[in-house]
Amino acid sequence: MANSSSGVAIHDDCKLKFNELQSKRMHRFITFMMDNKGKEIIVDKIGDRTTSYEDFTSSLPEGDCRFAIYDFDFLTAEDVPKSRIFYILWSPDNAKVRSKMLYASSNERFKKELNGIQLEVQATDAGEISLDALKDRVK
């Protein structure tokens, strides 16, 4: 399906893999990227349930943008286990301007395709998506 503001299509696997993460809890994270022609959003990487948060953050490229979903498990102040699905727009400062613009213009439309996102983060550096930063968001 094409994105009206950027003309970018969203591959069917994106929604399928998101639903596997959300409903079946098959994955810990999914990263999504533009294909080489900048015409379609595709699945980039998938981390299984045993994948660490460090593995997730190291999967994000230092010099390019990505969309990402992370299923964050945590304990409440009352020691109740909970989970929140984070949507992350990764747009590092040193990414190419064209890439930043393409991801920014596709962001809202892509987010709407992934029904069930609970929290959103737009990050330009690793500190903005540190484990502590996510913990602060779920308090």
UniProtKB/Swiss-Prot annotation:
Pfam families linked: Cofilin_ADF (PF00241)
Keywords annotated in UniProt: Actin-binding, Cytoplasm, Cytoskeleton, Plant defense
Keyword set includes Nuclease: no
Name the UniProt record assigns to this protein: Actin-depolymerizing factor 4
Gene Ontology MF: a single term: actin filament binding
Cellular localization per UniProt: Cytoplasm, Cytoskeleton
Origin: domain of life: Eukaryota
InterPro entries documented for this protein: ADF-H, ADF-H/Gelsolin-like_dom_sf, ADF/Cofilin
GO cellular component, one term: cytoplasm
Its biological purpose: Actin-depolymerizing protein. Severs actin filaments (F-actin) and binds to actin monomers. Involved in innate immunity. Required for the expression of defense-related genes PR1A, LOX2 and CHS1 upon biotic stresses. Required for basal resistance to the fungal blast (Magnaporthe grisea), bacterial blight (Xanthomonas oryzae pv. oryzae, Xoo) and the herbivorous insect brown planthopper (Nilaparvata lugens, BPH). Involved in the promotion of seed germination. Required for the expression of alpha-amylase genes during seed germination.
Knockout-associated phenotype: Decreased germination rates due to decreased alpha-amylase activity during seed germination. Increased susceptibility to infection by the fungal blast (Magnaporthe grisea), bacterial blight (Xanthomonas oryzae pv. oryzae, Xoo) and the herbivorous insect brown planthopper (Nilaparvata lugens, BPH). Almost no induction of the defense-related genes PR1A, LOX2 and CHS1 after exposure to biotic stresses.
Assembly, per entry: Interacts with LECRK1 (via kinase domain).
Underlying gene: ADF4
Keyword Cytoplasm on entry: yes
Similarity annotation: Belongs to the actin-binding proteins ADF family.
One BP term from GO: actin filament depolymerization
Major site of localization recorded for this protein: cytoplasm
Organism for this UniProt entry: Oryza sativa subsp. japonica (Rice)
